[in-house]
């Protein structure tokens, strides 16, 4: 892998660990999710907060600032000077999380001069990890137990390069849109 390999590994581990924290709350029959409302009236749960804390801590070992959906608001004047930054949505699909329909993800991207150079999407309910890095390609790793921390060698050995051929069994399209409308799958 290229020089982003270490950052990719950090992001993968952070996403999986955040996914575990999310699932611990999601599967707790006693949990009310601690739902609050943000300034824009969108929901915020304790799972959002916990996942954000885990990811922010993991990414703090890198030299890049973190811009998170659930983090503190950072003025554009400050952000505009950043050449590289992490963009994070620790629980993308909070409304779906609350509905308990399983359609939510953990999203982490490293962006250089406005262009993503690596990204990680973890689907904790399905235990599926998608990741990509500039000059490396895109990959899928299935059956990652929430909280399990695979080595980079294990990730390389088990990951499947995307896109896969149409003949590959077990491919699932998780969502599709046409003209801004989500299509049923």
Please give the residue ranges for each predicted region.
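Flexible, active-site-adjacent loop/turn segments at secondary-structure boundaries
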Residues: 33, 42, 95-96, 102, ...
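Residue-level signal for inorganic ion chemistry
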Residues: 22, 48, 59, 94, ...
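Glycine-rich active-site/cofactor-binding loop and its immediate structural neighborhood
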Residues: 84-121
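Acidic beta-strand-loop-alpha-helix segment within the catalytic core
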Residues: 108-185
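Residues that scaffold the ATP/ADP-binding catalytic core of kinase and kinase-like folds
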Residues: 25, 96, 141
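Conserved beta-strand segments that form the floor/walls of ligand-binding pockets within enzyme
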Residues: 67, 87, 105, 131, ...
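N-terminal subdomain of lithium-sensitive/metallo-dependent phosphomonoesterases centered on the IMPase/IPPase/PAP
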Residues: 1-91
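Short glycine/proline-enriched turns and hinge-like loops at secondary-structure junctions
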Residues: 78-80, 98-102, 132
